[in-house]
Amino acid sequence: MKEGIHPKYEDITATCSCGNVIKTRSTIGHDLQLDVCSQCHPFYTGKQKVMDTGGRIDRFQKRFGSRIGGKKG
Protein backbone atom coordinates (compact mmCIF):
# COMPACT_ATOMS: atom_id res chain seq x y z
CA MET A 1 0.00 0.00 0.00
CA LYS A 2 1.08 3.54 -0.61
CA GLU A 3 2.05 5.58 2.40
CA GLY A 4 0.22 8.82 3.25
CA ILE A 5 -2.87 8.37 1.06
CA HIS A 6 -5.23 6.96 3.71
CA PRO A 7 -7.06 9.16 6.24
CA LYS A 8 -6.06 8.84 9.89
CA TYR A 9 -8.15 6.36 11.87
CA GLU A 10 -8.62 7.97 15.27
CA ASP A 11 -10.49 7.36 18.53
CA ILE A 12 -13.63 9.50 18.81
CA THR A 13 -16.44 9.89 21.33
CA ALA A 14 -20.10 10.00 20.28
CA THR A 15 -22.26 11.65 22.96
CA CYS A 16 -26.04 11.29 22.85
CA SER A 17 -28.50 13.89 24.11
CA CYS A 18 -29.60 11.38 26.78
CA GLY A 19 -26.06 11.32 28.18
CA ASN A 20 -24.93 7.98 26.77
CA VAL A 21 -21.28 8.06 25.67
CA ILE A 22 -20.01 5.74 22.94
CA LYS A 23 -16.30 5.41 22.25
CA THR A 24 -15.42 4.25 18.75
CA ARG A 25 -12.90 4.77 15.96
CA SER A 26 -13.46 6.79 12.80
CA THR A 27 -11.79 8.81 10.08
CA ILE A 28 -14.09 11.79 10.75
CA GLY A 29 -11.49 13.32 13.03
CA HIS A 30 -13.75 14.94 15.67
CA ASP A 31 -16.25 13.96 18.37
CA LEU A 32 -19.93 13.57 17.49
CA GLN A 33 -23.15 14.79 19.12
CA LEU A 34 -26.06 12.37 18.58
CA ASP A 35 -29.79 13.11 18.88
CA VAL A 36 -30.80 9.51 19.64
CA CYS A 37 -29.03 6.25 20.37
CA SER A 38 -30.00 2.68 21.24
CA GLN A 39 -30.36 3.68 24.91
CA CYS A 40 -33.10 6.27 24.29
CA HIS A 41 -34.73 5.47 20.93
CA PRO A 42 -38.32 4.21 21.44
CA PHE A 43 -37.82 1.26 19.07
CA TYR A 44 -34.97 -0.15 21.16
CA THR A 45 -36.40 0.72 24.59
CA GLY A 46 -39.74 -0.97 23.91
CA LYS A 47 -41.74 2.23 24.49
CA GLN A 48 -42.81 2.55 20.88
CA LYS A 49 -46.42 3.69 20.40
CA VAL A 50 -48.64 3.64 17.35
CA MET A 51 -50.49 6.92 16.97
CA ASP A 52 -53.86 6.92 15.20
CA THR A 53 -54.17 10.52 14.15
CA GLY A 54 -57.72 11.59 13.53
CA GLY A 55 -59.22 8.10 13.23
CA ARG A 56 -57.45 7.45 9.95
CA ILE A 57 -57.13 3.74 10.62
CA ASP A 58 -60.87 3.44 11.32
CA ARG A 59 -61.70 5.42 8.21
CA PHE A 60 -59.43 3.14 6.15
CA GLN A 61 -61.04 0.03 7.64
CA LYS A 62 -64.52 1.36 6.76
CA ARG A 63 -63.55 2.04 3.16
CA PHE A 64 -61.38 -0.98 2.39
CA GLY A 65 -61.88 -3.43 5.27
CA SER A 66 -64.03 -5.89 3.35
CA ARG A 67 -61.60 -5.97 0.42
CA ILE A 68 -58.48 -6.75 2.44
CA GLY A 69 -57.78 -10.46 2.75
CA GLY A 70 -61.19 -11.35 1.36
CA LYS A 71 -62.13 -12.90 -1.91
CA LYS A 72 -63.26 -10.77 -4.80
CA GLY A 73 -66.90 -11.23 -5.47
From Swiss-Prot:
One of its GO terms (molecular function) is metal ion binding. Gene3D superfamilies: Ribosomal protein L31. GO terms for biological process: translation. Zn(2+) binds at C16, C18, C37, C40. PROSITE patterns: RIBOSOMAL_L31. Binds 1 zinc ion per subunit. Keywords: Metal-binding, Ribonucleoprotein, Ribosomal protein, RNA-binding, rRNA-binding, Zinc. NCBIfam families: L31 (TIGR00105), PRK00019.1 (NF000612), PRK00528.1 (NF001809). This is Large ribosomal subunit protein bL31. It comes from Marinobacter nauticus (strain ATCC 700491 / DSM 11845 / VT8) (Marinobacter aquaeolei). The lineage of its organism: Bacteria, Pseudomonadati, Pseudomonadota, Gammaproteobacteria, Pseudomonadales.
